[in-house]
């Protein structure tokens, strides 16, 4: 007999960890990931979104729930501390969330402000809000006035916190228009300017 190979397959063995062990393991992996990301950016990068989409209600298999292992506020506090401890220069750390046309943007702003406030303590400071802003311009005057009022009130709520606010992924669409005339394009441009002011 020659060239005989034998293979055994052993069934998977699950070694269950205690909640404390899981938290320790997850925190160590988080520290590696955040540390490597922030260190790689070096002094050239001074701003990071430390938390993205905390108000998202849809959680699927692609979403890792840090809070389930480390605590709902503790994981954010740990992430902020890890990021700040990694570099010697000042970092601006933001909490980022999408605001869509179908949202009650004022209520959502209030919800995000309250959430950020719950994360902060004497050692944990979040510098600002990163707003992924998607809006619609309406050709209906009353609807558009309501849109502008809501956006204005949203920004007033954020301004009242004294924190920085930045807009990213800014998108604007046109509602209730079959075609977009030159006048509508001008009105959309004015709405963009209104938002950015």
Q: Would you name each region that the model predicts?
A:
Residues 1, 46-50, 92-95, 127-132, ...:
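Structural recognition of the beta-strand scaffold that forms the well-ordered cores
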Residues 7-91, 95-113, 139-153, 178-190:
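Active-site cleft segment of glycoside hydrolase catalytic domains centered on the general acid/base Glu
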Residues 36-46, 115-130, 190-197:
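Structural recognition of alpha->loop->beta junctions
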Residues 54-55, 99, 132-134, 171:
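Catalytic metal-binding/acid-base residues of hydrolase active sites
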Residues 112-148:
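Long, low-complexity, intrinsically disordered polar/charged segments
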Residues 122, 154-171:
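Aromatic-lined glycan-binding groove of carbohydrate-active enzymes
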Residues 133-134, 165-176, 183-197:
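Substrate-binding cleft of secreted/luminal carbohydrate-active enzymes
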């Amino acid at each position: 007999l020659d060239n005989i190979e034998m293979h055994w397959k052993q069934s998977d063995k699950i070694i269950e960890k205690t909640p404390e062990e899981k938290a320790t393991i997850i925190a160590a992996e988080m520290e590696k990931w955040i540390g490597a990301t922030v260190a790689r950016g070096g002094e050239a990068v001074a701003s990071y979104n430390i938390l993205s989409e905390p108000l998202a209600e849809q959680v699927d298999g692609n979403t890792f729930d840090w809070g389930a292992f480390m605590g709902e506020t503790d994981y954010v506090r740990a992430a902020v501390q890890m990021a700040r401890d990694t570099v010697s220069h000042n970092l601006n750390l933001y909490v980022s969330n999408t605001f869509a046309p179908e949202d009650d943007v004022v209520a959502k702003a209030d919800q995000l402000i309250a959430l950020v406030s719950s994360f902060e303590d004497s050692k944990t400071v979040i510098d600002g809000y990163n707003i992924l802003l998607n809006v619609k311009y309406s050709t209906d005057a009353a609807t558009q006035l309501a849109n502008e009022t809501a956006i204005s009130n949203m920004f007033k709520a954020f301004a009242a916190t004294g924190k920085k606010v930045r807009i990213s992924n800014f998108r604007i669409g046109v509602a209730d228009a079959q075609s977009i005339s030159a006048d509508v394009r001008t009105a959309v441009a004015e709405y963009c300017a209104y938002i950015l002011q």
